[in-house]
């Protein structure tokens, strides 16, 4: 598009970060490979490519707790990438993220959206980390037993 300045910051960029849960101080690592990171008119965008068909509704949510659903796994993945990018960069930034599906190229970049907002600030990512911490805490809670979630089948 005319007037848009894009700078490629990374292709197949390996990201990782070490985090600690607030409650029990459990240390854990996140790592992943982002297909593309770019700056578009000064806005950082995390982009994941999918070879199959993909629908934009899978990237929309209102509360972070929704991301535990198998139907929102791509949104969860993108937020993990955003959190890792944020933790590896000292500047206070706002991130956008999305998916480009090769089978739905006509849709262009399908943006990750929380309550119709496509920007994820440091504060938003801190709130997502709290959700991630809860998951880690549950995994390590010896008082909880694991069972298959019927709703995820």
What would you call each of these model-derived segments?
Residues 1-153:
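RecB-family 4Fe-4S metal-dependent nuclease core
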